[in-house]
């Protein structure tokens, strides 16, 4: 019997594991684990496999991958592809960024796993995945013949765009936790908590007219709009932007409001280009595993 391959989606909070047979994810094999319940990824893998032999490993990890190894950004876990292969007896093991894995999944997702938010005017070409969860990152998805090419990125740790219309004092509040003011300081679960804490201090006088939750949402939408607008012109994703992650799903009902669409499309002579970019939300929590299966198919002779 042919050995299955191990697929891994290692996030900052949870890890999903699954098996692929014949190059496709077996949905019945998927299990989710809380990272806090395990001392490290090795113990988690051993608990899942229970000695079962596997052929190969593809893991999407929430952190930068360098020389086949990764230090996760939001949990003190270190992964090394060679060590994973030795641990499991796999012939080969590969680490990619978790947003790369999401990008590799785009052509293999069932239609019901995505919902359109802004229709735009999509044209076949570059696509973009924007992840908003425990952290923040993007992946640009390019077609190369019948294959996909998804380069790594750590865009969530680039600096927030210039936004002079943000409430006075907010940037100073954010800088206390993250002096380099990365995008992730706002557009992530912890970032939302930071905004809510600042709103709760009551120093935002115009915001006192709003419910704290409404004010927090408005500020977050405003930042997201500027970031999405900049990404639209940086990458020209003519085939659209796909949002993923828990924070993205929470904000999705608000993304047709002018508080989001106006700043996102306010790009001067390039407003029409920004307005043509479609936006959709992905609901499938197994997408990264599907993408890991696609990645293995592409690199396996």
Tell me the role of every PLM-derived stretch:
Residues 50-95, 103-113, 129, 250-253:
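Short beta-strand-loop/turn "lid" adjacent to the catalytic site in phosphate-handling enzymes
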Residues 93-122, 206-221, 226:
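ATP-dependent carbohydrate kinase catalytic cores
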Residues 114-119, 123-178, 182, 260-265, ...:
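Glycine-rich phosphate-binding loop of actin/hexokinase-like ATP-binding domains
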């Amino acid at each position: 019997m042919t050995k299955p391959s191990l697929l891994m989606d290692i996030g900052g909070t949870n890890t999903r594991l699954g098996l692929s047979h014949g190059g496709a994810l077996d949905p019945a094999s998927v299990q989710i684990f809380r990272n806090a319940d395990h001392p490290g990824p090795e113990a988690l893998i051993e608990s899942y496999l229970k000695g079962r032999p596997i052929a190969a490993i593809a893991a999407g990890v929430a952190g930068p991958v360098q020389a086949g190894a990764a230090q996760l950004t939001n949990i003190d876990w270190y992964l090394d592809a060679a060590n994973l292969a030795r641990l499991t007896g796999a012939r080969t093991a590969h680490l990619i960024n978790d947003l790369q894995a999401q990008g590799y999944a785009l052509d293999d997702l069932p239609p019901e796993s995505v919902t359109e938010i802004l229709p735009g005017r999509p044209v076949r070409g570059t696509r973009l995945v924007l992840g908003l969860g425990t952290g923040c990152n993007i992946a640009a998805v390019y077609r190369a013949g019948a294959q996909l090419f998804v380069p790594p990125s750590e865009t969530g740790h680039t600096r927030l765009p210039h936004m002079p219309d943000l409430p006075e004092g907010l940037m100073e509040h954010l800088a206390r936790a993250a002096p380099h003011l990365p995008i992730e300081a706002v557009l992530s679960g912890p970032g939302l908590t930071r905004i809510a804490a600042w709103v709760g201090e009551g120093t935002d006088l115009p915001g006192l007219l709003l419910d704290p939750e409404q004010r927090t949402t408005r500020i977050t939408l405003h930042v997201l709009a500027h970031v999405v607008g900049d990404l639209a012109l940086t990458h020209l994703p003519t085939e659209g932007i796909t949002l993923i992650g828990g924070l993205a799903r929470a904000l999705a009902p608000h993304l047709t409001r002018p508080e989001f669409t106006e700043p996102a499309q306010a790009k001067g002579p390039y407003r029409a280009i920004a307005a043509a970019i479609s936006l959709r939300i992905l609901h499938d929590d197994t997408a990264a595993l599907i993408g890991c299966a696609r990645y293995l198919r592409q690199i396996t002779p």
